[in-house]
Structure formats: structure tokens, C-alpha cells
Amino acid sequence: MTTTPAPERAETEAMIAEVLSQYPKKAAKFRAKHLKANDPEGSKECEVKSNIKSRPGVMTIRGCAYAGSKGVVWGPVKDMVTISHGPVGCGQYSWATRRNYAHGHLGVDNFTAMQITTDFQEKDIVFGGDPKLEQGLDEIVELFPLAKGISVQSECPIGLIGDDIEAVARVSSRLDIPVMRVRCEGFRGVSQSLGHHIANDAVRDHVLGTGGDSFEQTDYDVALIGDYNIGGDAWASRRILEEMGLRVIAQWSGDGTINEMASTHLSKLNLIHCYRSMNYICTTMEERFGTPWTEFNFFGPTKIISSMRKIAEFFDDEIKAKNRAAIAGYQRCVDEITKAFRPRLEGKRVMLAVGPAPRHTIGSYEDLGMEVVGTAAEFAHRDDYTGPTACSKEGTGLYDDPSRVFELEEVAKRPDLIGSGPKEKYIFQKMGTPIEPYHGVDGFAIFARDMARHQQPGLDLLEAPWSKAGEVA
């Protein structure tokens, strides 16, 4: 595979101009605010507009507020049953593509992979769905006696017809189990980002600080915030922290429990992975309980080691000494990996297309000598772009809320490889572009191996059945 030269601002701006030229004048003016070439100096002309309504007709792939609450924040809590209050389709779509791993027995004390819904029908729209929800809550308690809580996630019809889920949840206090009601109807806000905020508010109002002093505390207790254990990444983070000598008392919310969430205020430090979805609760705990928090990044050795050092600064000399020993062990490992794979990947071009601004993963590619030439985000806010601006080089393309049908297809022609999330990946898979996500020190070895493997032109050697002569059987 031939590697194309490094990007420059003029090249990126020319590509953006070509994309915008395909739009009507008014739409082009609107989209021009969302497509920019990166300027490390942060000039006003290169500021990316974000977190505003998508243009009608632009085929956005944003999620909704319901997906942000149910699919991201509440769904991964393993000992809570999440019930989607509304039609069956929303719950299935929001959960079918996520791999939130969790310990436990499915359907006994782990409910993360279960799709439970009130299955709204037309008559429920006409007559109201409160009785159906109350019946559903009764059935959950009967079927899953080891469940520690229930979260009710509202879909669009609930808000449109004005069902009072708060009243139903209060009536269900007789069930002797906490019932969290979350007003996360999909039409609220401009993307799933508002769903994150609504879910954080529900945790703040109904869960945070309710856990008692049920365990012996130490000076080294930390909480993992905004790590949803997709593919087991929270477990990789936990291993690193434990090798530093720290004790993880709570995971929010991948492989986490409601009791952990209720007791997180006892943590000495909150470590936030996904800033966009959980910064709200971290600032709340800082204001209410005085708990400090910091972002961390365990993607790629450079960022891992930098984050380990930053975290260690919050603790005493014992933790700092253990941290230095852990880093020394990791360094030998990653040096061998980099030596083996960097020569094969040097200069390859990558585009990252995910939900929030992809500032976490840029370092992994750069550690292998690859160059990130574009970053696309669906629900980033203005402050999210300070990450890519700081990490990305001059001329890197920044694409906010890109159109699935046209914009992503055009900018995807530029790189050698695409890194993407579960919603974005399908279009790139159909285009024959390889994609993989990895996390942690152990994951870096697999990441490097597979990045090299994906550069083999295997797909170019295959012929699609419909391109052959004759009919497909």
C-alpha cells in the first residue's frame, strides 16, 4: 500500500471546499462552520461550531438523549434492571451494538445485556402507559429478585403524551427497591449529549451520597468515572491503577453496581475517562463533597505513562515509588512493541470518527508513527475541541456532526485507516476500510499487531459476488 504525504493546511482546506461545493448555497454556509482545518494557535477562523441542531437533510448519525442516558450511563450498571418505557425498537437499537462487559450471571445478578421494554402500542398512546409501566415494574421484581434497583428510561412517546412516570415510580415504593425515573425522551436536546447530562442529574438526585460507610476506607481509594467497560477497557484501566498501589472502589458505570455509585463520594480521587458524558457528576462531587477529579488517558504508552504520573502526584511517596516501578516494567514492554511495528506503520494516515471528540486515541496511533489527518465527532461540545486542537497537528481536519452519506465518504478517501465507534463503523466496513479499538498496556500490543495486519491489501484481492458475470445464486 502506498503511503500518501503528510497533510498540510492547504490540502485540508481544499478537500473541505470540495465537499462544501456539493451543497446548496445556504446549506454550504451552515456546514462550513462545522468543517475546519486545525490551527494549533486557536484562531477564530478555525473555531468549530458544535452542539447545535443538525441541518435538516444532512444525514447525521447522532444519537438521541434516550441513547445517551440508557445506552451510555445507566445501561452498564450491572445489578440494575433498565426498562425502556416506550416502543420496542428504541431499546433494541440503543443496546445491540455496545459491548459493555460485566461479571456475574446474566439474568441473575447481571442484567446489562437484557432488553426490557413496556412495548408501547397504539392503544397505549391513546389511553396512556402508566398501568403498563406499573405492571412492568411488578414483573421485574418478581422475575429478578437479586436486582438492586430499576431505572425507567423514557422514550419519545412518553413525553409527547405526558405520562407521569414520577408518579408511577412513587407508587412502586411498595416494591422495596429503588426505582430511578429518567426523563430522557429522544427529542430533547440536539444529540445524545443531553441524555448524558440528564442521566448525571438523576444519579445526583437519587443515588449520589446515599451509600453508607459499609467498607474500611484507605488513603488510596479512587473511583473510575465515565469508563463503560466496552470490550473490557475498564478492567485494563483497573489493572494499571492497582499496580500503582491504588484501590478502585467504584466503576461508573461499566461493570459497576448501584452501591458503588452510592458510595463514590468516599473516594479520595475521581478519575474520569469519558469527559463529555460524566464531567457533570465529577464537578458535583467536587462541590458537594470536596472530592478532586482529573482526566486520564490509558490509550497508547505515551498517554498511559503521562496519566500515571499525573495521578501519582495526588498521593504520597509510597504510591509514587510504586508508580515508577510500574512504569519501568511497562516501558520495556512497549519499547519492544514499538521497535517491532513502528517501521511498518510509519507515515500511515488515520482518520478518527467517533461520538465525542477523539482526543483519547490520537496518541496510540502517533506512538506507532502514524499520523492522524482528520477527526470527526457527533456530539462534541466547544470545550471538547480543546483536546484535538492540542493533540492534532497543523492542518488536521476537524469535522463536527458530519453527514453520513456524503461528507464521511469523501473525507474517508484521504487516510489509510479509519478508527471509529459502533455507529460510525458500518459505512467504513462497507467501503472496505479496516477498523479496531484497543485500550491499556496489554491492549497496545494487540493494537500494534492489528494495525500492521490491517495494512495488508487483503480486501483488494477479493471480488464482490455482484461484480461477477451472471446472477448471484
From Swiss-Prot:
Reaction(s) catalysed (UniProt annotation): N2 + 8 reduced [2Fe-2S]-[ferredoxin] + 16 ATP + 16 H2O = H2 + 8 oxidized [2Fe-2S]-[ferredoxin] + 2 NH4(+) + 16 ADP + 16 phosphate + 6 H(+)
Protein residues bound to [7Fe-Mo-9S-C-homocitryl] cluster: C274
Gene3D superfamilies: Nitrogenase molybdenum iron protein domain (3.40.50.1980)
Gene Ontology BP terms: nitrogen fixation
Cofactor binding remark: Binds 1 [8Fe-7S] cluster per heterodimer. Binds 1 [7Fe-Mo-9S-C-homocitryl] cluster per subunit.
Listed cofactors: [8Fe-7S] cluster; [7Fe-Mo-9S-C-homocitryl] cluster
Binding site for [8Fe-7S] cluster: C64, C90, C156
Pfam families xrefs: Oxidored_nitro (PF00148)
UniProt keyword annotations, A-Z: ATP-binding, Iron, Iron-sulfur, Metal-binding, Molybdenum, Nitrogen fixation, Nucleotide-binding, Oxidoreductase
CDD domains noted in UniProt: Nitrogenase_MoFe_alpha
GO molecular function, one term: nitrogenase activity
EC number: 1.18.6.1
Any Gene Ontology CC annotation: molybdenum-iron nitrogenase complex
PANTHER family membership: NITROGENASE MOLYBDENUM-IRON PROTEIN ALPHA CHAIN
Assembly and binders: Tetramer of two alpha and two beta chains. Forms complex with the iron protein (nitrogenase component 2).
Function noted in UniProt: This molybdenum-iron protein is part of the nitrogenase complex that catalyzes the key enzymatic reactions in nitrogen fixation.
Stated family: Belongs to the NifD/NifK/NifE/NifN family.
The name this protein goes by in its record: Nitrogenase molybdenum-iron protein alpha chain
Species: Frankia alni
Primary gene name: nifD
